[in-house]
Amino acid sequence: MHVHSQSEDEARVSHGHAHGAVDAEILASSRGIRVTKISLAVLGVTAVVQLVIVGFTGSVALLADTIHNFGDAATALPLWAAFTLSRKLPTKRFNYGYGRAEDLAGLLIVLSILATGIFAAYESINRLGDPPEIDYLWVVALAAVFGFLGNETVALYRMKVGKEIGSAALIADGHHARVDGLTSLAVLFGAVGVWLGYPLADPIVGLVISAAILRIVIETSKSVFSRLLDGVEPEVPDEVREVASVTDGVQEVAEVRVRWLGHKMLAEVNIVVDPGLSVGAGHDIAENVHHQLLHNLKYLSNATVHVDPVGLAGEEFHRHGPGNTEHQQEHVEEHAHDSEDEPDHGHSHDN
């Protein structure tokens, strides 16, 4: 008996696996929300302290750095909203859930980093022609160190958790915090340069840091845009294929497709089995493949497994179907031609 699972025979998540996958997704989203809350608080305090210092030092560079810190804190809000949305159940309209909101938040973060780099370069170029005078150099330097430590702490925290839960957007937000930490360093070096009698040190360091920010934008955007276009790391499909191919009853893995949806991965796998198997036996093999995939791939939250008989794998089966001989095809075409010549016996809707 030929076995091919489609709607009724697709391997679905068993109750145990379903609860496990959902629990893992909720936990990951909860961790993401916690990170955004903590980083928002840390960067908010950092920015407020710097703003107070700006008030009595008049440091333009420190003011720019303070604005960057407020901006970085603000980018935590759409990411927070995205993690919250990802916990909602799928609907008829959004039947894959709301994970893509996280990728869109990542895009906003990349654009924010780019804006920071452009602003830093603009300010540095302006200061080349008119180096600013800075009062209370030691206070400005301490504020810059405080800003750097606050931003770098948040950056390390965001990137660590982002890698653990598979969130490109959270990693990008970590890079955003690091960028603001670099602008704090620019303020520090500028203050030291003025103290040493080299006022041009401030804008020169600012330009160097602007170039570093541009590089961060390029590297971060690769990951974010890749996920928006359903890209995945090249080794992931190979891992899926390897796990599926060593499962008992699988003779071949015909096709593998994997994509990210927020911080979770979805997979579609076509496996080839003995055509003499019953529908139930083919379904059991598919369930086992599903089980192995969920337990062996860290970020995978669901996998759809299709079963094809040997000789007609994947799209080949859909083109020809089981027992779809040339005679049957001619019969179908002849029947279709005859039906065109028959009068329409349908009900009339005319009044």
State the predicted function of each range.
Residues 2-39, 55-57, 61-67, 71-351:
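Alpha-helical transmembrane segments and adjacent TM-loop junctions that form the membrane-embedded core
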Residues 38-50:
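The first (N-terminal) embedded transmembrane alpha-helix
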